[in-house]
Every structure is written in structure tokens, then in C-alpha cells.
């Protein structure tokens, strides 16, 4: 799976541009502030209908423009081309089109174009709140388990109903019990999918990490969000009074976490910034391998400022792992010489220079294997 064409209009400082990227490695280079990251942001918009740089829409849309648009053609794993498009307006409205038809949700984009982002904010996967690690986990499950999304939607609905009742007390006991049962059933299914995914992810992650850095004491464990020896419905019943006092449900898969520890301690508190980056990269590359194994296509990797925090040895090791995935990669950097020679001679590498928002292809190296 790869993007064969990307057209961008009115995204930040970028001039209107149509790119024909390599199916494998694409390096975008230029000075800081030139617009390199904005190219990755445009692709991210195309795949997820949102920016990774801003929760607000306004900064993404070019000054004095009413909307930004991104179109792309994706070559799917079955060899069929799919056309994607997204337009986002200043008022917040957005239109998603897939093969000429309006899409119902951003989930359809995500399924068609799986994206993995590695950028300076990726440290939050280790340092941030459990919600960030749940999102990482659920992204992986979503892309390998087609039954996950409808169950996750059931869970969210049941959780909203229960939390509303906890705050306002407007459900009769029978309705309350029914929603507790639904929440418990959906939670057990979500837990099973997550647990199965972690069991598959751990050995791939450990093997990938070993290629990057020696951290033998680093462990990955899963906490499901409630006592592993108790049924959730019992936990909900016993914690009802406290939940009412707090105004929300305190136990359940919405409290799950992926715990990353080194010698028994929170890894984020011990690892250097460079080591943290390598751990995050290993996690995201491992996810890519699982998607490949599930035969649901391949990820497209967006790697912002790959050289930062890494010495040459680790930089080259990371390039090799990305290359071995056999997927499409977009990488930004200031100095292209740091990455230009990190690939095999038969790997197609496209180089794009970005200057003051203008993107121009400068070189294509190698040929598709």
C-alpha cells in the first residue's frame, strides 16, 4: 500500500503542489520553517481528517483561504487504486470523499490509509497520560481486528449512558442494570482483543528494539482497567456509590494502560531522550509488522526530523528497520546527507526540497525491487 499521488492546497504555508512520491522512501529536506512538516501534516489530514500539530483547525488553513484540501491516490494491497479527498473549512465543516462517494466517518479514511507518525511529540507515548497509550493500542487493534470498531462503539455508548446516569440520576434501576450489563459485555470483548494484540506485539517489539538498542530489562505489560481477578459487573456494583460521588465510571477499559518499565521503574523517568525515541520507534515499527502479517495492507510512515536525538549508528539502524518493512516512508530532515546514503542501492528513494513553502522533487535514486 502506498500513495502514488498527493495534491495539497491551502495547508499552512505550502504552495499548491502535486507530488508523485516513491513507493518506498521519500526524504523532504530544507531549513527549519520551510514547510517540510506541513507536507507530513497534509498527508496526516488525508489519512485521519485531523492535524497532529494543532487541535484547532484555524492554524492549518492558509491565511485568507476559506478551506484546505488534500487529495491522494492510494495503491491498495490488492493492486487497485483508491482515490481519497478531504476538505476542511474554517467553520469546522469537513467533507471526506473515497472513490467519488462521501464517507461516513474518518474511520473509513484510517482503514484505507493506515498512517504511523513518529515526531518530537512521540515521546508522549512514554511520558504522557494513559489515554495516549490506549490510543496507540486501539489503533493497532483496529487495523488487525475488523470486529473491534463496532464493539468499541458499543462500549462508548454504554459508558456515556452510565456516566450520564451517575451525574444526573435519571435512570430507573432496571435500565441502570441493563446498561451495566452492556458495558460489562463490551468491556470483556475489548479486553480480549487488546490482550490478544499485546501478546502478538510483545515479541515483535522486543525483536525490533534489540536491533536498535540494548535494553534487556525493559518490559511491556498491559493493565486492563480493573482487577484482573474480578468480573467488571461486580466491580461496577461495588463502586457505585463512589462513582456517583465522582460523577463518572472509574473502572473499565477506559482506564486501561500499556505499562513500559525498565528494571521495575517507569521507563520515561530513566531513559535518555535518544533511548526514548528508539523505544517509540520500535513500538510503531512493530505495529507495522503486525498489519503486514494480518494482510490488511501496509502502514505509511510519517517521520518528522528523524536525525534529531540520534547518533549516526542509531540513525542508520532505524533507516534499515524502516526499509525492511517494505512500506512507504516520508521523512523530514534539515541536512539530506545524513539520510541519503542510509538505503540499499535498489531501494527507490525520492528527494524533495522544501523552501518557503514550495516543494520540488530534486532526485530519484534506485529502482523498485
Swiss-Prot record:
| Keywords of this entry | ATP-binding, Cytoplasm, DNA damage, DNA repair, DNA replication, DNA-binding, Nucleotide-binding, SOS response
GO CC, sorted alphabetically, is:
cytoplasm
Function, please?
A: The RecF protein is involved in DNA metabolism; it is required for DNA replication and normal SOS inducibility. RecF binds preferentially to single-stranded, linear DNA. It also seems to bind ATP.
Where do the coiled-coil regions begin and end?
A: none
Q: What is this protein called?
A: DNA replication and repair protein RecF
Primary subcellular site in the record, as a coarse category: cytoplasm
Q: Give one GO biological process term.
A: SOS response
Localization (cell): Cytoplasm
What PANTHER family does the annotation carry?
DNA REPLICATION AND REPAIR PROTEIN RECF
GO molecular function annotations of the record? ATP binding; single-stranded DNA binding
What's the short name of a Pfam family annotated to this entry? SMC_N
Which source organism does the UniProt entry give? Pseudomonas paraeruginosa (strain DSM 24068 / PA7)
